[in-house]
């Protein structure tokens, strides 16, 4: 259930589900047909469409921020935000140097592949012989420091790319070891920790699973436990580079290097795979440069440069990439098929080239959000200031579901798309807890554009990402501070 207003008419409240649209202003069905799936979160469903069978409902219940108060313009938080930005200029300068280094290595990869306009032609049908697709794979492999890569619009998400790698490599009797605590929520059903029986999880295919808990207190990898963690049946060790929805630091490349060494010392046959979502271009190298065998990610996150309309990638040793592609397509087809139209293919090239810059701006925006929210008395991870490793996700502990709703609503209202929609926590595929999402983005789910989301569970943390320029967060944070002040 969401509330929203149309900019074309006087303000009015609309409550709706997939079964009803109710206009509280005049009790009639409104001509603005905004709808959603049952129990789904705002930005994960269709907003516009023909109305279904109409039935008027009472106002929904749920988690909503308190009613807005009139804000005295003299109390605007803008001055505080700009003061934080001024103090962060040395940090921003460091990030600019990171951007420059990553632009250089990306351009070298493009030059090595000799990219020209003929690579943007695209393909149809089976997609056999697509020169552009093959060249893009070469660039991604180079950027990731890997032997091979597959960049495909056919991956529907980062979770899908990771799942293809897991199912491509693991066989009945093998064990998957999650090295840095539990993985991201959406992988739990892939693994079989929860979910609908009969969905074909790894567990249902006879693959074992074990979690290595994080070290108490620090939230870091438990190096002592990892030193003896590999068993004869352990076939893959999975490292999640970002914090995801966990209360822990981002893994550094040095963490990944050390983990590879510790794991391989016990068994060289273990495949070390890295969930690289939100990790691309946050350092001057990628997991392949420190010995990882595989890494996977989403094109609507960092490496798509906010331009790519969908897709994901797998990069690693050639036989492992081939195994993942056999899962994406079919054995015997693998990398030889997968049509993509020319316009989308050009955006995949252009987005990858833009990614160092857009990721750097997101890092700056995260540092600004951390400084402002820490100054307002909230706990943040990473803490304000320069951080190593750089993190594309800034976690802000708000302390209550109402504060999460207020924060998300302020972000959504400050966004270019769907600013009239108030996000409400709801059930979203892949997540065990209700999740609130605010990402009024041009590409659905492209949190690299700018977004904030989080599961409704203690300590009620919202996770901020993206921003094509850091000043977008100046505008957003002004709304956020105002909204949170109105809850007091």
Language-model segment annotations:
Residues 58-113, 374, 385, 389-393, ...:
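N-terminal glycine-rich, Lys/His-bearing helix-loop that initiates the first secondary-structure elements
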Residues 8, 29-32, 63:
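Leucine-biased recognition of intrinsically disordered, low-complexity hydrophobic segments
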Residues 74-89, 96, 106-112, 116-119, ...:
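Conserved PLP-enzyme active-site core in the AAT-like
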Residues 1-8, 16:
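N-terminal chloroplast transit peptides
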Residues 10, 54:
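Cationic, low-complexity basic patches in intrinsically disordered or flexible, solvent-exposed regions
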């Amino acid at each position: 259930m969401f509330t929203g207003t149309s900019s074309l008419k006087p303000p009015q409240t609309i409550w709706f589900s997939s079964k009803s649209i109710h206009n509280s202003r005049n009790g009639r069905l409104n001509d603005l047909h905004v709808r959603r799936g049952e129990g789904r979160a705002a930005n994960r469903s269709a907003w516009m469409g023909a109305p279904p069978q109409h039935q008027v409902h009472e106002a929904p219940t749920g988690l909503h921020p308190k009613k807005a108060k009139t804000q005295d313009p003299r109390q605007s938080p803008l001055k505080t935000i700009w003061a934080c930005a001024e103090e962060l200029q040395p940090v921003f300068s460091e990030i600019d140097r990171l951007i420059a280094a990553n632009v250089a290595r990306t351009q070298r990869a493009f030059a090595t592949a000799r990219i020209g306009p003929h690579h943007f032609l695209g393909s149809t049908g089976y997609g056999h012989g697509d020169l552009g697709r093959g060249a893009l794979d070469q660039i991604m492999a180079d950027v990731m420091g890997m032997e091979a890569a597959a960049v495909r619009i056919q991956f529907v998400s980062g979770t899908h790319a990771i799942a293809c790698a897991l199912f491509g490599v693991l066989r009945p009797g093998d064990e998957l070891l999650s090295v840095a605590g539990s993985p991201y929520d959406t992988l739990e059903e892939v693994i079989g920790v929860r979910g609908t029986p009969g969905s074909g999880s790894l567990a249902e295919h006879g693959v074992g699973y074990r979690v290595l808990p994080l070290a108490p207190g620090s939230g870091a990898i438990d190096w002592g436990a990892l030193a003896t963690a590999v068993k004869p049946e352990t076939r893959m060790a999975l490292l999640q580079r970002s914090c995801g929805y966990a209360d822990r630091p981002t893994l550094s490349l040095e963490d990944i290097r050390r983990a590879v060494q510790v794991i391989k010392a016990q068994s060289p046959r273990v495949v070390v795979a890295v969930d690289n979502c939100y990790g691309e271009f946050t350092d001057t190298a990628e997991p392949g440069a420190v010995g990882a065998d595989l890494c996977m990610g989403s094109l609507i996150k960092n490496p798509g440069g906010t331009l790519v309309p969908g897709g994901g990638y797998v990069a690693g040793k050639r036989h492992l990439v081939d195994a993942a592609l056999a899962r994406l397509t079919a054995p015997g087809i693998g990398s030889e098929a997968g049509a993509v139209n020319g316009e989308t293919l050009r955006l995949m090239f252009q987005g990858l080239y833009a990614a160092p810059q857009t990721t750097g701006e997101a890092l700056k925006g995260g540092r600004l959000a951390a400084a402002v929210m820490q100054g307002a008395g909230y706990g943040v991870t990473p803490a304000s200031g320069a951080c190593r490793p750089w993190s594309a996700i800034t976690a802000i502990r708000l302390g209550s579901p109402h504060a999460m709703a207020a924060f998300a609503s302020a972000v959504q209202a400050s966004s270019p798309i769907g600013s009239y929609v108030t996000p409400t926590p709801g059930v979203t595929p892949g997540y065990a807890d209700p999740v609130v999402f605010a990402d009024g983005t041009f590409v659905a789910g492209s949190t690299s554009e700018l977004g904030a989301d989080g599961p409704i569970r203690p300590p009620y943390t919202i996770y901020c990402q993206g921003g094509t320029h850091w000043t977008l967060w100046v505008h957003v944070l002004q709304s956020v501070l105002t909204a949170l002040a109105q809850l007091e």
